[in-house]
Protein backbone atom coordinates (compact mmCIF):
# COMPACT_ATOMS: atom_id res chain seq x y z
CA UNK A 1 0.00 0.00 0.00
CA UNK A 2 1.75 3.16 -1.22
CA UNK A 3 0.80 6.78 -0.58
CA UNK A 4 2.16 10.11 -1.75
CA UNK A 5 2.68 13.49 -0.08
CA UNK A 6 0.47 16.31 -1.39
CA UNK A 7 0.94 20.03 -0.81
CA UNK A 8 -1.93 22.44 -0.09
CA UNK A 9 -1.64 26.14 -1.01
CA UNK A 10 -4.11 29.01 -0.65
CA UNK A 11 -4.44 32.49 -2.08
CA UNK A 12 -6.91 35.08 -0.78
CA UNK A 13 -7.20 38.16 -2.98
CA UNK A 14 -9.65 40.93 -3.73
CA UNK A 15 -12.41 40.13 -6.17
CA UNK A 16 -15.86 38.66 -6.34
CA UNK A 17 -16.42 36.40 -3.30
CA UNK A 18 -15.83 32.78 -4.32
CA UNK A 19 -14.14 29.64 -3.03
CA UNK A 20 -12.34 27.70 -5.77
CA UNK A 21 -10.50 24.40 -5.25
CA UNK A 22 -8.22 23.09 -8.02
CA UNK A 23 -5.89 20.11 -8.50
CA UNK A 24 -7.79 17.15 -10.01
CA UNK A 25 -10.10 16.69 -7.03
CA UNK A 26 -12.69 14.03 -6.33
CA UNK A 27 -16.15 15.01 -5.10
CA UNK A 28 -15.22 14.15 -1.49
CA UNK A 29 -12.47 16.80 -1.54
CA UNK A 30 -14.61 19.43 -3.28
CA UNK A 31 -17.38 18.97 -0.71
CA UNK A 32 -14.95 20.23 1.95
CA UNK A 33 -15.80 23.74 0.70
CA UNK A 34 -19.11 23.75 2.57
CA UNK A 35 -17.81 21.84 5.58
CA UNK A 36 -15.00 24.34 6.08
CA UNK A 37 -17.25 27.35 5.52
CA UNK A 38 -19.40 26.30 8.49
CA UNK A 39 -16.63 24.93 10.74
CA UNK A 40 -14.43 28.03 10.40
CA UNK A 41 -17.41 30.23 11.24
CA UNK A 42 -17.95 28.02 14.29
CA UNK A 43 -14.50 29.00 15.69
CA UNK A 44 -14.89 32.70 14.85
CA UNK A 45 -12.65 32.51 11.78
CA UNK A 46 -15.27 32.96 9.07
CA UNK A 47 -14.15 33.03 5.46
CA UNK A 48 -13.57 36.56 4.17
CA UNK A 49 -15.81 37.94 1.42
CA UNK A 50 -12.97 37.71 -1.09
CA UNK A 51 -11.70 35.44 -3.84
CA UNK A 52 -10.25 32.27 -2.24
CA UNK A 53 -8.28 29.78 -4.33
CA UNK A 54 -6.94 26.53 -2.86
CA UNK A 55 -4.48 24.46 -4.91
CA UNK A 56 -3.57 20.82 -4.31
CA UNK A 57 -0.35 19.55 -5.86
CA UNK A 58 0.86 17.47 -7.60
CA UNK A 59 -2.01 18.44 -9.90
CA UNK A 60 -1.67 15.34 -12.08
CA UNK A 61 -2.75 12.89 -9.36
CA UNK A 62 -6.38 12.41 -8.37
CA UNK A 63 -7.07 13.55 -4.80
CA UNK A 64 -9.82 11.68 -2.97
CA UNK A 65 -11.09 11.23 0.56
CA UNK A 66 -11.78 13.62 3.43
CA UNK A 67 -8.23 13.68 4.82
CA UNK A 68 -7.53 17.01 3.04
CA UNK A 69 -10.01 18.90 5.26
CA UNK A 70 -7.59 19.66 8.09
CA UNK A 71 -4.62 20.89 5.99
CA UNK A 72 -7.02 23.03 3.92
CA UNK A 73 -8.42 24.61 7.08
CA UNK A 74 -4.93 25.29 8.42
CA UNK A 75 -3.68 27.07 5.28
CA UNK A 76 -6.83 29.23 5.25
CA UNK A 77 -6.25 30.10 8.91
CA UNK A 78 -2.64 30.95 8.07
CA UNK A 79 -3.78 33.25 5.25
CA UNK A 80 -6.06 35.00 7.78
CA UNK A 81 -3.18 35.43 10.23
CA UNK A 82 -4.58 33.01 12.80
CA UNK A 83 -1.49 30.75 12.69
CA UNK A 84 2.10 31.53 11.55
CA UNK A 85 2.48 30.50 7.87
CA UNK A 86 6.12 29.46 8.38
CA UNK A 87 5.00 26.82 10.90
CA UNK A 88 3.02 25.02 8.20
CA UNK A 89 6.00 24.50 5.88
CA UNK A 90 7.28 21.61 8.00
CA UNK A 91 3.90 20.36 9.22
CA UNK A 92 2.12 17.29 7.83
CA UNK A 93 -1.58 17.00 8.60
CA UNK A 94 -4.62 14.87 7.70
CA UNK A 95 -8.13 14.75 9.09
CA UNK A 96 -11.80 15.28 8.35
CA UNK A 97 -13.38 18.43 9.76
CA UNK A 98 -16.98 18.33 10.96
CA UNK A 99 -19.45 21.21 10.93
CA UNK A 100 -18.80 21.74 14.65
CA UNK A 101 -15.02 21.98 13.97
CA UNK A 102 -14.31 18.55 15.44
CA UNK A 103 -11.55 16.49 13.77
CA UNK A 104 -12.84 13.09 12.72
CA UNK A 105 -11.11 9.80 11.97
CA UNK A 106 -9.94 9.07 8.40
CA UNK A 107 -8.83 5.91 6.63
CA UNK A 108 -5.29 4.98 5.62
CA UNK A 109 -3.36 7.06 8.17
CA UNK A 110 -0.79 4.31 8.77
CA UNK A 111 0.17 4.04 5.09
CA UNK A 112 0.17 7.84 4.73
CA UNK A 113 2.48 8.26 7.72
CA UNK A 114 4.95 5.78 6.25
CA UNK A 115 5.06 7.90 3.07
CA UNK A 116 5.30 11.18 4.99
CA UNK A 117 8.14 9.79 7.12
CA UNK A 118 10.33 9.73 4.01
CA UNK A 119 10.03 13.54 3.75
CA UNK A 120 11.17 14.21 7.33
CA UNK A 121 8.56 16.72 8.50
CA UNK A 122 9.11 18.40 11.84
CA UNK A 123 5.65 17.59 13.16
CA UNK A 124 2.65 15.43 12.24
CA UNK A 125 -0.98 16.28 12.96
CA UNK A 126 -3.67 13.59 12.80
CA UNK A 127 -7.13 12.94 14.31
CA UNK A 128 -7.01 11.78 17.92
CA UNK A 129 -8.94 8.63 16.96
CA UNK A 130 -6.07 7.69 14.60
CA UNK A 131 -3.35 8.29 17.19
CA UNK A 132 -2.78 4.56 17.70
CA UNK A 133 -1.65 4.29 14.08
CA UNK A 134 0.63 7.30 14.51
CA UNK A 135 2.30 5.85 17.60
CA UNK A 136 3.00 2.62 15.70
CA UNK A 137 5.29 4.35 13.17
CA UNK A 138 8.63 4.63 14.93
CA UNK A 139 9.28 7.71 17.06
CA UNK A 140 7.55 10.31 14.92
CA UNK A 141 6.43 13.53 16.66
CA UNK A 142 2.74 12.77 16.09
CA UNK A 143 -0.01 14.84 17.70
CA UNK A 144 -3.62 13.68 17.83
CA UNK A 145 -6.16 16.51 17.90
CA UNK A 146 -9.90 16.49 18.52
CA UNK A 147 -10.85 19.92 17.14
CA UNK A 148 -9.69 22.80 14.97
CA UNK A 149 -9.10 24.93 18.07
CA UNK A 150 -6.73 22.28 19.45
CA UNK A 151 -4.94 22.11 16.08
CA UNK A 152 -4.50 25.91 16.09
CA UNK A 153 -3.23 25.82 19.66
CA UNK A 154 -0.69 23.14 18.75
CA UNK A 155 0.62 24.99 15.67
CA UNK A 156 0.95 28.26 17.62
CA UNK A 157 2.72 26.62 20.58
CA UNK A 158 6.47 26.54 21.19
CA UNK A 159 8.51 23.39 20.61
CA UNK A 160 8.53 22.57 24.34
CA UNK A 161 4.80 23.15 24.62
CA UNK A 162 4.15 20.99 21.54
CA UNK A 163 6.12 18.15 23.11
CA UNK A 164 4.05 18.42 26.29
CA UNK A 165 0.82 18.38 24.27
CA UNK A 166 1.96 15.27 22.40
CA UNK A 167 2.72 13.47 25.68
CA UNK A 168 -0.67 14.43 27.10
CA UNK A 169 -2.45 13.21 23.97
CA UNK A 170 -0.54 9.93 24.05
CA UNK A 171 -1.38 9.41 27.74
CA UNK A 172 -5.06 10.08 27.05
CA UNK A 173 -5.09 7.63 24.16
CA UNK A 174 -3.27 4.94 26.18
CA UNK A 175 -5.71 5.30 29.07
CA UNK A 176 -8.67 4.99 26.71
CA UNK A 177 -7.09 2.01 24.96
CA UNK A 178 -6.74 0.18 28.28
CA UNK A 179 -10.44 0.70 28.88
CA UNK A 180 -11.37 -1.02 25.65
CA UNK A 181 -11.70 -4.76 26.05
CA UNK A 182 -10.04 -6.50 23.15
CA UNK A 183 -12.21 -9.17 21.60
CA UNK A 184 -10.83 -12.57 22.46
CA UNK A 185 -10.55 -14.76 19.40
CA UNK A 186 -11.01 -18.37 20.38
CA UNK A 187 -9.48 -20.71 17.84
CA UNK A 188 -10.68 -24.33 18.01
CA UNK A 189 -8.05 -26.93 18.85
CA UNK A 190 -7.03 -29.60 16.35
CA UNK A 191 -7.42 -32.18 19.12
CA UNK A 192 -11.18 -31.80 18.77
CA UNK A 193 -10.99 -33.31 15.28
CA UNK A 194 -11.33 -37.07 15.63
CA UNK A 195 -10.27 -39.57 12.98
CA UNK A 196 -8.82 -36.93 10.64
CA UNK A 197 -5.10 -37.62 10.97
CA UNK A 198 -4.44 -37.39 7.23
CA UNK A 199 -6.19 -34.02 6.95
CA UNK A 200 -4.42 -32.71 10.05
CA UNK A 201 -1.09 -33.76 8.55
CA UNK A 202 -1.95 -31.86 5.36
CA UNK A 203 -2.92 -28.79 7.40
CA UNK A 204 0.37 -28.86 9.31
CA UNK A 205 2.36 -29.11 6.06
CA UNK A 206 0.37 -26.22 4.61
CA UNK A 207 1.01 -24.03 7.67
CA UNK A 208 4.71 -24.91 7.79
CA UNK A 209 5.41 -23.95 4.18
CA UNK A 210 2.57 -21.50 3.37
CA UNK A 211 1.11 -23.94 0.84
CA UNK A 212 -2.35 -23.83 -0.72
CA UNK A 213 -4.68 -26.58 0.52
CA UNK A 214 -7.90 -28.02 -0.91
CA UNK A 215 -10.21 -30.13 1.26
CA UNK A 216 -12.91 -32.27 -0.36
CA UNK A 217 -15.55 -34.45 1.22
CA UNK A 218 -19.23 -34.92 2.11
CA UNK A 219 -21.10 -32.38 4.27
CA UNK A 220 -20.49 -32.51 8.00
CA UNK A 221 -17.11 -34.27 7.86
CA UNK A 222 -15.18 -31.42 9.51
CA UNK A 223 -13.78 -29.43 6.57
CA UNK A 224 -14.88 -26.06 7.93
CA UNK A 225 -13.89 -27.01 11.48
CA UNK A 226 -10.38 -27.91 10.30
CA UNK A 227 -10.11 -24.57 8.51
CA UNK A 228 -11.11 -22.74 11.69
CA UNK A 229 -8.38 -24.59 13.58
CA UNK A 230 -5.64 -23.62 11.12
CA UNK A 231 -4.93 -20.08 12.47
CA UNK A 232 -4.00 -21.67 15.79
CA UNK A 233 -0.85 -23.26 14.35
CA UNK A 234 0.32 -20.43 12.08
CA UNK A 235 3.56 -18.66 13.09
CA UNK A 236 3.23 -15.15 14.57
CA UNK A 237 3.72 -12.12 12.36
CA UNK A 238 6.91 -10.07 12.50
CA UNK A 239 6.72 -6.37 13.38
CA UNK A 240 7.17 -5.48 9.71
CA UNK A 241 4.28 -7.77 8.74
CA UNK A 242 2.07 -6.26 11.46
CA UNK A 243 2.73 -2.78 10.06
CA UNK A 244 2.06 -3.98 6.52
CA UNK A 245 -1.21 -5.74 7.34
CA UNK A 246 -2.39 -2.92 9.61
CA UNK A 247 -1.78 -0.38 6.82
CA UNK A 248 -4.08 -2.42 4.57
CA UNK A 249 -6.84 -2.60 7.17
CA UNK A 250 -6.42 1.11 7.89
CA UNK A 251 -6.90 1.92 4.19
CA UNK A 252 -9.99 -0.31 4.17
CA UNK A 253 -11.39 1.39 7.28
CA UNK A 254 -11.32 -1.87 9.26
CA UNK A 255 -8.61 -1.11 11.82
CA UNK A 256 -10.38 -1.38 15.17
CA UNK A 257 -9.60 1.42 17.66
CA UNK A 258 -6.44 2.29 15.73
CA UNK A 259 -4.59 -0.74 17.11
CA UNK A 260 -2.18 -2.76 15.01
CA UNK A 261 -3.31 -6.16 13.76
CA UNK A 262 -1.57 -8.77 15.90
CA UNK A 263 -2.81 -12.06 14.43
CA UNK A 264 -2.56 -13.28 10.87
CA UNK A 265 -5.73 -12.45 8.93
CA UNK A 266 -8.27 -15.19 8.33
CA UNK A 267 -10.67 -14.00 5.63
CA UNK A 268 -13.68 -16.10 4.68
CA UNK A 269 -15.86 -14.49 1.98
CA UNK A 270 -19.35 -15.78 1.22
CA UNK A 271 -19.68 -17.88 -1.92
CA UNK A 272 -21.84 -15.16 -3.49
CA UNK A 273 -18.92 -12.68 -3.42
CA UNK A 274 -18.38 -10.89 -6.74
CA UNK A 275 -15.15 -10.43 -8.67
CA UNK A 276 -14.90 -6.83 -7.42
CA UNK A 277 -15.44 -7.89 -3.80
CA UNK A 278 -12.62 -10.40 -4.19
CA UNK A 279 -10.11 -8.13 -5.96
CA UNK A 280 -11.18 -4.66 -4.81
CA UNK A 281 -13.61 -2.37 -6.55
CA UNK A 282 -14.75 1.17 -7.09
CA UNK A 283 -13.51 4.07 -9.20
CA UNK A 284 -10.71 4.39 -6.64
CA UNK A 285 -10.49 0.73 -5.57
CA UNK A 286 -10.62 -0.29 -1.95
CA UNK A 287 -8.75 -3.41 -0.83
CA UNK A 288 -10.64 -6.58 -1.68
CA UNK A 289 -10.73 -9.95 0.05
CA UNK A 290 -7.43 -11.10 -1.47
CA UNK A 291 -5.68 -8.00 -0.08
CA UNK A 292 -7.34 -8.26 3.34
CA UNK A 293 -5.98 -11.83 3.51
CA UNK A 294 -2.41 -10.63 2.87
CA UNK A 295 0.09 -12.52 5.09
CA UNK A 296 -2.76 -14.73 6.26
CA UNK A 297 -5.35 -17.23 5.05
CA UNK A 298 -8.07 -16.82 2.42
CA UNK A 299 -10.64 -19.51 3.19
CA UNK A 300 -13.18 -20.34 0.49
CA UNK A 301 -15.86 -22.52 2.04
CA UNK A 302 -18.07 -24.33 -0.49
CA UNK A 303 -15.47 -23.43 -3.10
CA UNK A 304 -17.34 -24.97 -6.03
CA UNK A 305 -20.31 -22.70 -5.25
CA UNK A 306 -18.30 -19.60 -6.18
CA UNK A 307 -18.66 -18.24 -9.69
CA UNK A 308 -15.90 -19.45 -11.97
CA UNK A 309 -14.89 -15.88 -12.86
CA UNK A 310 -14.48 -15.09 -9.17
CA UNK A 311 -12.24 -18.11 -8.65
CA UNK A 312 -10.13 -17.49 -11.75
CA UNK A 313 -9.10 -13.99 -10.61
CA UNK A 314 -7.19 -15.73 -7.80
CA UNK A 315 -4.69 -17.21 -10.22
CA UNK A 316 -2.53 -14.09 -10.58
CA UNK A 317 -2.18 -13.27 -6.86
CA UNK A 318 -1.52 -16.94 -6.08
CA UNK A 319 1.54 -16.77 -8.36
CA UNK A 320 2.77 -13.20 -7.81
CA UNK A 321 1.55 -12.29 -4.33
CA UNK A 322 -0.14 -9.10 -5.56
CA UNK A 323 -3.17 -8.01 -7.56
CA UNK A 324 -3.10 -5.54 -10.45
CA UNK A 325 -6.20 -3.39 -10.99
CA UNK A 326 -6.84 -1.14 -13.98
CA UNK A 327 -9.44 1.57 -13.40
CA UNK A 328 -10.41 4.81 -15.11
CA UNK A 329 -8.48 6.78 -12.47
CA UNK A 330 -5.28 4.81 -13.03
CA UNK A 331 -3.58 1.49 -12.36
CA UNK A 332 -3.33 0.11 -8.84
CA UNK A 333 -1.18 -2.64 -7.33
CA UNK A 334 -2.30 -4.12 -4.01
CA UNK A 335 -0.45 -6.78 -1.98
CA UNK A 336 -2.15 -10.18 -1.95
CA UNK A 337 0.30 -12.75 -0.58
CA UNK A 338 -2.07 -15.22 1.05
CA UNK A 339 -2.41 -18.94 1.68
CA UNK A 340 -5.49 -20.28 -0.11
CA UNK A 341 -7.55 -22.80 1.82
CA UNK A 342 -10.50 -24.26 -0.05
CA UNK A 343 -13.24 -26.65 1.06
CA UNK A 344 -15.72 -28.23 -1.32
CA UNK A 345 -18.24 -31.00 -1.71
CA UNK A 346 -17.69 -33.50 -4.55
CA UNK A 347 -21.13 -32.78 -6.06
CA UNK A 348 -24.19 -30.53 -5.53
CA UNK A 349 -25.75 -32.85 -2.93
CA UNK A 350 -22.35 -33.61 -1.43
CA UNK A 351 -22.36 -37.44 -1.32
CA UNK A 352 -20.80 -38.48 -4.63
CA UNK A 353 -19.58 -41.22 -5.32
CA UNK A 354 -21.81 -42.93 -2.71
CA UNK A 355 -24.66 -43.90 -5.05
CA UNK A 356 -26.79 -44.98 -2.11
CA UNK A 357 -26.99 -41.36 -0.96
CA UNK A 358 -26.00 -39.23 -3.98
CA UNK A 359 -28.94 -37.89 -5.97
CA UNK A 360 -26.88 -36.17 -8.69
CA UNK A 361 -26.61 -37.16 -12.34
CA UNK A 362 -23.14 -37.56 -13.84
CA UNK A 363 -23.54 -34.39 -15.91
CA UNK A 364 -24.48 -32.45 -12.77
CA UNK A 365 -21.31 -33.62 -11.04
CA UNK A 366 -19.17 -32.64 -14.05
CA UNK A 367 -20.79 -29.21 -14.32
CA UNK A 368 -20.41 -28.62 -10.57
CA UNK A 369 -16.69 -29.45 -10.53
CA UNK A 370 -16.07 -27.57 -13.79
CA UNK A 371 -16.15 -24.34 -11.78
CA UNK A 372 -12.76 -25.37 -10.40
CA UNK A 373 -10.67 -24.77 -13.51
CA UNK A 374 -7.58 -26.80 -14.32
CA UNK A 375 -5.16 -23.85 -13.92
CA UNK A 376 -6.63 -23.10 -10.48
CA UNK A 377 -6.39 -26.72 -9.32
CA UNK A 378 -2.83 -26.86 -10.66
CA UNK A 379 -1.96 -24.10 -8.18
CA UNK A 380 -3.22 -26.11 -5.19
CA UNK A 381 -0.16 -27.64 -3.51
CA UNK A 382 -2.10 -30.08 -1.34
CA UNK A 383 -5.39 -31.89 -1.90
CA UNK A 384 -6.98 -34.00 0.80
CA UNK A 385 -10.15 -36.06 0.83
CA UNK A 386 -12.01 -36.13 4.14
CA UNK A 387 -14.24 -39.13 4.68
CA UNK A 388 -17.06 -39.63 7.14
CA UNK A 389 -15.73 -40.35 10.64
CA UNK A 390 -17.32 -43.34 12.43
CA UNK A 391 -19.69 -42.14 15.12
CA UNK A 392 -17.87 -44.12 17.83
CA UNK A 393 -14.89 -41.77 17.46
CA UNK A 394 -16.97 -38.97 18.95
CA UNK A 395 -17.12 -40.71 22.34
CA UNK A 396 -13.44 -41.62 22.55
CA UNK A 397 -10.88 -39.60 24.51
CA UNK A 398 -13.05 -36.56 25.21
CA UNK A 399 -11.46 -35.66 28.54
CA UNK A 400 -9.76 -32.24 28.81
CA UNK A 401 -6.25 -33.74 28.89
CA UNK A 402 -6.81 -35.07 25.39
CA UNK A 403 -6.75 -31.55 23.96
CA UNK A 404 -3.16 -31.00 25.09
CA UNK A 405 -1.96 -34.53 24.42
CA UNK A 406 1.31 -34.97 22.56
CA UNK A 407 1.23 -35.13 18.76
CA UNK A 408 -2.48 -34.49 18.64
CA UNK A 409 -3.42 -30.92 19.49
CA UNK A 410 -2.68 -27.48 18.14
CA UNK A 411 0.08 -26.83 20.68
CA UNK A 412 2.32 -29.63 19.39
CA UNK A 413 1.47 -28.89 15.76
CA UNK A 414 2.34 -25.21 16.21
CA UNK A 415 5.71 -26.15 17.71
CA UNK A 416 6.45 -28.33 14.68
CA UNK A 417 5.45 -25.53 12.32
CA UNK A 418 7.69 -23.03 14.10
CA UNK A 419 10.66 -25.41 13.95
CA UNK A 420 10.10 -25.92 10.22
CA UNK A 421 9.92 -22.16 9.66
CA UNK A 422 13.20 -21.73 11.57
CA UNK A 423 14.89 -24.19 9.24
CA UNK A 424 13.59 -22.23 6.25
CA UNK A 425 14.89 -19.01 7.76
CA UNK A 426 18.32 -20.50 8.39
CA UNK A 427 18.47 -21.81 4.85
CA UNK A 428 17.71 -18.33 3.46
CA UNK A 429 20.15 -16.49 5.73
CA UNK A 430 21.70 -13.53 3.96
CA UNK A 431 18.59 -13.19 1.79
CA UNK A 432 14.95 -12.24 2.33
CA UNK A 433 12.96 -14.89 4.22
CA UNK A 434 10.92 -16.99 1.79
CA UNK A 435 8.52 -19.73 2.82
CA UNK A 436 8.87 -22.94 0.84
CA UNK A 437 5.51 -22.33 -0.82
CA UNK A 438 6.80 -19.00 -2.21
CA UNK A 439 10.09 -20.21 -3.71
CA UNK A 440 10.72 -19.21 -7.32
CA UNK A 441 12.03 -21.78 -9.86
CA UNK A 442 15.54 -20.38 -9.40
CA UNK A 443 15.28 -20.63 -5.63
CA UNK A 444 14.01 -24.21 -5.94
CA UNK A 445 17.23 -25.15 -7.72
CA UNK A 446 19.25 -23.39 -5.00
CA UNK A 447 17.44 -24.52 -1.85
CA UNK A 448 15.80 -27.80 -2.92
CA UNK A 449 18.47 -29.92 -4.67
CA UNK A 450 17.52 -33.50 -5.55
CA UNK A 451 19.82 -36.52 -5.71
CA UNK A 452 19.88 -38.88 -8.71
CA UNK A 453 17.52 -41.35 -7.05
CA UNK A 454 15.06 -38.57 -6.18
CA UNK A 455 15.27 -37.12 -9.70
CA UNK A 456 14.48 -40.49 -11.30
CA UNK A 457 11.61 -41.06 -8.88
CA UNK A 458 10.07 -37.65 -9.63
CA UNK A 459 10.49 -38.11 -13.41
CA UNK A 460 8.66 -41.45 -13.36
CA UNK A 461 5.94 -40.17 -11.05
CA UNK A 462 5.38 -37.00 -13.09
CA UNK A 463 5.01 -39.05 -16.30
CA UNK A 464 2.48 -41.37 -14.69
CA UNK A 465 0.50 -38.54 -13.09
CA UNK A 466 0.82 -36.18 -16.05
CA UNK A 467 2.25 -33.36 -13.93
CA UNK A 468 3.01 -30.01 -15.54
CA UNK A 469 6.28 -28.20 -14.89
CA UNK A 470 4.46 -26.01 -12.38
CA UNK A 471 3.05 -29.13 -10.76
CA UNK A 472 6.56 -30.61 -10.39
CA UNK A 473 7.79 -27.38 -8.80
CA UNK A 474 4.93 -27.48 -6.31
CA UNK A 475 5.67 -31.12 -5.46
CA UNK A 476 9.30 -30.21 -4.74
CA UNK A 477 8.23 -27.28 -2.55
CA UNK A 478 5.90 -29.49 -0.52
CA UNK A 479 8.58 -32.18 -0.24
CA UNK A 480 11.00 -29.55 1.07
CA UNK A 481 8.48 -28.60 3.76
CA UNK A 482 7.91 -32.23 4.73
CA UNK A 483 11.68 -32.67 5.07
CA UNK A 484 11.82 -29.55 7.25
CA UNK A 485 9.09 -30.93 9.51
CA UNK A 486 11.12 -34.11 9.92
CA UNK A 487 14.35 -32.18 10.54
CA UNK A 488 16.07 -33.40 7.37
CA UNK A 489 18.56 -31.31 5.41
CA UNK A 490 17.95 -33.07 2.09
CA UNK A 491 14.80 -34.12 0.29
CA UNK A 492 14.35 -37.89 0.16
CA UNK A 493 12.21 -40.23 -1.92
CA UNK A 494 9.84 -40.66 1.02
CA UNK A 495 9.28 -36.89 1.15
CA UNK A 496 8.56 -36.74 -2.58
CA UNK A 497 6.22 -39.71 -2.24
CA UNK A 498 4.20 -38.02 0.48
CA UNK A 499 4.08 -34.77 -1.53
CA UNK A 500 2.80 -36.70 -4.57
CA UNK A 501 0.20 -38.42 -2.40
CA UNK A 502 -1.21 -35.06 -1.35
CA UNK A 503 -0.90 -33.79 -4.92
CA UNK A 504 -3.52 -36.29 -6.09
CA UNK A 505 -6.37 -34.15 -7.41
CA UNK A 506 -8.62 -37.12 -8.13
CA UNK A 507 -9.94 -36.70 -4.59
CA UNK A 508 -12.70 -34.62 -6.19
CA UNK A 509 -13.87 -37.56 -8.26
CA UNK A 510 -13.17 -40.65 -6.17
Positions of predicted regions on the chain:
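Short beta-strand elements
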Residues: 4-12, 278, 381-388
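Short hydrophobic alpha-helical runs that function as membrane-insertion/retention elements
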Residues: 122-127, 141-145, 213-216, 236, ...
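Peripheral, non-AAA+ core regions of ATP-driven protein-machinery
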Residues: 1-214, 224, 471-472, 490-493, ...
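Basic, amphipathic alpha-helical bundle interface domains used for macromolecular binding and assembly
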Residues: 25-33, 46-48, 55-65, 285, ...
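Catalytic P-loop NTPase motifs of RecA-like helicase/translocase cores
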Residues: 100, 300-307, 350
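Conserved alpha-helical scaffold flanking the Walker A/P-loop in AAA+ ATPase domains
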Residues: 204, 259-260, 265, 276-298
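Walker B catalytic acidic pair
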Residues: 295, 301-302, 313
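Walker A/P-loop
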Residues: 215-254
